[in-house]
Amino acid sequence: MAETLAHRFTEFLLESNALKFGDFTLKSGRKSPYFINAGAFDDGKKIAALGAFYAEKISQAIVHNTIPRNIDTVFGPAYKGIPLAVSTAIALTAGHNMTVGYTFDRKEKKDHGDGGWMVGTPLTDGMKVLLVDDVMTAGTAVREVIPKLKAEANVEVVGLVLSVDRMEKTKDSDLSAVKAVEAEFGFPVLAIANVREIFDAAAKMKNADSAPLLSHDIQQRAAAYLEEYGA
């Protein structure tokens, strides 16, 4: 049986040292049994592979009519979204015969040279824009970037693709951040893998000594964590 996209992505996260199991305190103050470090994708090989995973997820979503094929540009919010937008656009062109642009925002508006808030493919009225980001915790980045996009042009945001869906309740709702953003903005939010898929995949893997990759303790803590915070 062919391995699923989520399984292959979990292997990639582990090989890249982007996924760690243990005891971590998140910005929210929650104690988590796992941590995803997007900063681990720090060379051309890793970021190219990451872009290919995003492109594969996007291609699947197009086949299932979740998002349209005629995407005009892939938008990544600065700063972490910049390499995601570029590598995804390259992978869609090279591997999926799609010609798409890439766009990202500046943290501060530039008033000389090419100027403005945006870099890359210029945004114009009617364009279909697909957002990419790494891991959503509260949806803050999306809520900050949508007004910037709309101020630039009357674009249509057709979806958001993440690397991982943590599937956690937000602080003020029983909805996950993903579901809350979908409800607020009306576009689909997809992830290459969700945390349950990642733990399911990792539970079947072995380490270099042929022992289970996940200890019984980590698996129990993961189950307890998702029981308490899962949405």
UniProtKB/Swiss-Prot annotation:
GO terms for biological process: 'de novo' pyrimidine nucleobase biosynthetic process; 'de novo' UMP biosynthetic process; pyrimidine ribonucleoside biosynthetic process. It catalyses: orotidine 5'-phosphate + diphosphate = orotate + 5-phospho-alpha-D-ribose 1-diphosphate. Orotate binds at T137, R166. Keywords: Glycosyltransferase, Magnesium, Pyrimidine biosynthesis, Transferase. Its cofactor is Mg(2+). 5-phospho-alpha-D-ribose 1-diphosphate binds at residues 27, 79-80, 106-107, 110, 112, 133-141. One of its GO terms (cellular component) is cytoplasm. The keyword rRNA-binding does not apply. This is Orotate phosphoribosyltransferase. Belongs to the purine/pyrimidine phosphoribosyltransferase family. PyrE subfamily. Its EC number is 2.4.2.10. GO terms for molecular function: magnesium ion binding; orotate phosphoribosyltransferase activity. It comes from Bifidobacterium longum (strain DJO10A). Homodimer. It comes from the Bacteria. Catalyzes the transfer of a ribosyl phosphate group from 5-phosphoribose 1-diphosphate to orotate, leading to the formation of orotidine monophosphate (OMP). Pfam families: Pribosyltran (PF00156). Pathway: Pyrimidine metabolism; UMP biosynthesis via de novo pathway; UMP from orotate: step 1/2.
